[in-house]
C-alpha cells in the first residue's frame, strides 16, 4: 500500500515539475512573440552599422610612412609593407601595402596605433568572395571608399523599415505600441494592385478611344 502511494506521489511530483518547466518555456516563447521582428531581408534590407563599427580597413597611401607599426601591433603580423630605402633622401619609399581580410580579425590595433592616421575602419562588411585570394587587398583596393548603407539606392535601410517607428534605428527595446514608420507588406501589395488596375483601366480607355477615332475617320 505504501509503495503504491509512493509511486503516486513521485508521479505527481514529476508531472508538476514537467508542467512548471513547460510553462517557463512557453512564457519565454510568448514574450518573444510580442516583440518586433529583428531579422532583415538581406540583401534588399541591410543593417546600419554603428559609428564605431570595425569593418573593412581604409588605407591612404599618401599618408603612410612605412614605419611598420601596424605590423608590430597586429596580433598575427598581417599587414604586408613593401618598401625600399632611398639612399639620396635616406628615407623609406613605400611600394606596396596589402592586408588579407581572409585572415584579419578586425581588432583595430593597426588603426589605433598608426602615427599618421593613414588607416581607418569603415562600415563595409560585405567582403564575401568565391576565391580567398581576392580577399587580399592591395593599396589600391584599400584606398577605395566604401558605399554607405544609408546612401545605397539598392537597399532599404533599417531606419526606414516598416518594423520600426520613425527615428528609431535599433530594434531592441522598442515598445510594440508605438506606430510604425512605414507600411505593412500587405498594404504595399494592395497599393501595387490598385496602381496596376488603374493602369489597365487607362489603357482600356485609350484603346477604346483610339478605336472610336478610327471608326469615325473610316465613316
Curated annotation (Swiss-Prot):
Swiss-Prot/TrEMBL GO biological process terms: photosynthesis, light reaction
Gene Ontology molecular function terms on file: 4 iron, 4 sulfur cluster binding; iron ion binding; NADH dehydrogenase (ubiquinone) activity; quinone binding
Alphabetized UniProt keyword annotations: 4Fe-4S, Iron, Iron-sulfur, Membrane, Metal-binding, NAD, NADP, Plastoquinone, Quinone, Repeat, Thylakoid, Translocase
Ranges for region Disordered: 192-219
Compartment annotation: Cellular thylakoid membrane
Cofactor (UniProt): [4Fe-4S] cluster
Cofactor binding remark: Binds 2 [4Fe-4S] clusters per subunit.
Sequence ranges of Low complexity compositional bias: 208-219
Any single GO CC term annotated in Swiss-Prot or TrEMBL for this entry: plasma membrane-derived thylakoid membrane
Major subcellular site: membrane
Domain of life: Bacteria
Family in the record: Belongs to the complex I 23 kDa subunit family.
Annotated function: NDH-1 shuttles electrons from an unknown electron donor, via FMN and iron-sulfur (Fe-S) centers, to quinones in the respiratory and/or the photosynthetic chain. The immediate electron acceptor for the enzyme in this species is believed to be plastoquinone. Couples the redox reaction to proton translocation, and thus conserves the redox energy in a proton gradient.
Record's protein name: NAD(P)H-quinone oxidoreductase subunit I
Taxonomic source organism: Synechococcus sp. (strain CC9311)
Gene: ndhI
Amino acid at each position: 500500500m505504501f509503495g503504491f502511494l509512493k509511486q503516486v506521489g513521485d508521479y505527481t511530483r514529476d508531472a508538476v515539475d514537467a508542467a512548471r518547466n513547460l510553462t517557463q518555456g512557453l512564457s519565454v516563447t510568448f514574450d518573444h512573440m510580442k516583440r518586433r521582428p529583428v531579422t532583415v531581408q538581406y540583401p534588399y534590407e541591410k543593417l546600419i552599422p554603428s559609428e564605431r563599427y570595425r569593418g573593412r580597413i581604409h588605407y591612404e597611401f599618401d599618408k603612410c610612412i612605412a614605419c611598420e607599426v601596424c605590423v608590430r601591433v597586429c596580433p598575427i603580423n598581417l599587414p604586408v609593407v613593401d618598401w625600399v630605402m632611398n639612399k639620396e633622401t635616406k628615407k623609406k619609399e613605400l611600394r606596396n601595402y596589402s592586408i588579407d581580410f581572409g585572415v584579419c580579425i578586425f581588432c583595430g590595433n593597426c588603426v589605433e596605433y598608426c602615427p599618421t592616421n593613414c588607416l581607418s575602419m569603415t562600415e563595409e562588411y560585405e567582403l564575401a568572395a568565391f576565391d580567398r585570394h581576392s580577399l587580399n587587398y592591395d593599396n589600391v583596393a584599400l584606398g577605395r571608399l566604401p558605399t554607405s548603407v544609408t546612401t545605397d539606392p539598392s537597399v532599404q535601410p533599417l531606419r526606414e523599415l516598416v518594423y520600426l517607428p520613425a527615428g528609431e534605428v535599433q530594434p531592441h527595446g522598442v515598445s510594440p505600441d508605438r506606430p510604425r514608420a512605414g507600411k505593412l507588406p500587405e498594404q504595399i501589395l494592395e497599393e501595387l494592385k490598385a496602381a496596376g488596375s488603374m493602369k489597365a483601366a487607362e489603357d482600356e480607355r485609350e484603346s477604346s478611344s483610339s478605336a472610336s477615332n478610327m471608326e469615325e475617320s473610316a465613316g
